């Protein structure tokens, strides 16, 4: 299969418990200062939360966040482009919400090899061969934010250069996006469009919303270092990038404890397709060689635990209280788990 399914739960170093469940968020409130017309279409800076209203997509984290006036108000787990069709990086903007979109297959080898659709031959809205689902949101060629994905595709490679969501996720996202863009879009409106799957409807936002596409495999979140898998094999999990990230918070590697440094460097290697970076062992001092041996042992132990995992979390004391915000009101795309059926024993205890 071309799809690589990654585990939902991260591995956490330095603590026996997993990440705390984030508190539920609140719907955005209209705000004149949130108008993107007053916001320059420029990156907010590596590793940082934006000070304005925009969408942040970080491909290695399989995550999309909505910020309003610098506050994170909503998060989504997403599917990303396959390695041969990667999600690009850079600044885009969203100015339309298109309900029940048609799809014109592009002139690509994966379309030409298909026996179901032909290049340039329009596929109708609502057709089972249309992969875009109930909504598409253009963010600049060749990328879209669109629905149509099964829950199993969320958190995986799932598209040809787009942000992929389930239909329920993209409907939720469209309502928040519309409100930020100055357009009223009610639950009833969304339901009406879903009922009329053959009818394409374009909703134009009064204010286009900036969309920042990132490729950051290193992040500080909630006082912890998150090391994401280098999904597009861009050699980003290296010491030089770690030092740049720490420098954002006024730290250096020397500010970490020996155990923290060992765990961190092991995590970088374990989450890299091509571990390493600039490392000439012949020029290392004896002390550096000893440290490298510790890192290699930790990496080997960690790698055995990480098959299929998408991130490692390392607790670093000096980062306490710092970093990008944790997900808010996260929609994972997964169906809710049914409540456990009480056993006879628990029913007896309940009496």
Segments (PLM) and residue ranges:
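N-terminal pre-domains immediately preceding structured catalytic cores
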Residues: 1-163, 167-351
């Amino acid at each position: 299969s071309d799809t690589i399914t990654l585990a939902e739960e991260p591995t956490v170093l330095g603590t026996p418990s997993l990440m705390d469940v984030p508190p539920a968020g609140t719907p955005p409130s209209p705000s004149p200062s949130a108008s993107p017309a007053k916001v320059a279409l420029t990156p907010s800076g590596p590793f940082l939360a934006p000070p304005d209203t925009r969408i942040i997509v970080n491909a290695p984290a399989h995550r999309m966040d909505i910020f309003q006036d610098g506050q994170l108000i909503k998060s989504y787990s997403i599917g990303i482009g396959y390695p041969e069709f990667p999600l690009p990086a850079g600044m885009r903007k969203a100015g339309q919400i298109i309900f029940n979109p048609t799809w014109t297959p592009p002139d690509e080898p994966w379309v030409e090899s298909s026996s179901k659709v032909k290049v340039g031959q329009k596929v109708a809205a609502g057709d089972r061969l249309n992969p875009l689902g109930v909504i598409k949101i253009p963010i600049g060629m060749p990328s879209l934010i669109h629905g149509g994905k099964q829950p199993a595709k969320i958190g995986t490679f799932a598209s040809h250069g787009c942000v992929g969501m389930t239909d329920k996720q993209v409907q939720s996202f469209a309502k928040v996006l519309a409100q930020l863009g100055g357009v009223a879009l009610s639950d009833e409106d969304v339901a009406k469009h879903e009922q009329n799957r053959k009818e394409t409807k374009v909703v134009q936002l009064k204010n286009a919303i900036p969309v920042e596409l990132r490729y950051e495999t290193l992040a500080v979140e909630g006082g912890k270092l998150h090391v994401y898998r280098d999904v597009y094999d861009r050699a980003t999990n290296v010491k030089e990038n770690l030092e740049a990230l720490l420098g954002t918070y006024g730290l250096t590697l020397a500010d970490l404890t020996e155990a923290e440094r060992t765990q961190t460097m092991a995590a970088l290697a374990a989450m890299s397709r091509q571990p390493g970076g600039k490392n000439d062992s012949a020029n290392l001092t004896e002390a550096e060689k000893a440290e490298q041996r510790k890192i290699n042992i930790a990496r080997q132990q960690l790698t055995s635990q990480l098959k299929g995992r998408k991130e490692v979390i390392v607790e670093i004391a000096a980062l306490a209280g710092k970093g990008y915000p944790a997900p808010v009101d996260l929609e994972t795309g997964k169906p809710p788990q049914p409540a456990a059926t009480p056993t006879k024993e628990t029913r007896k205890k309940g009496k």
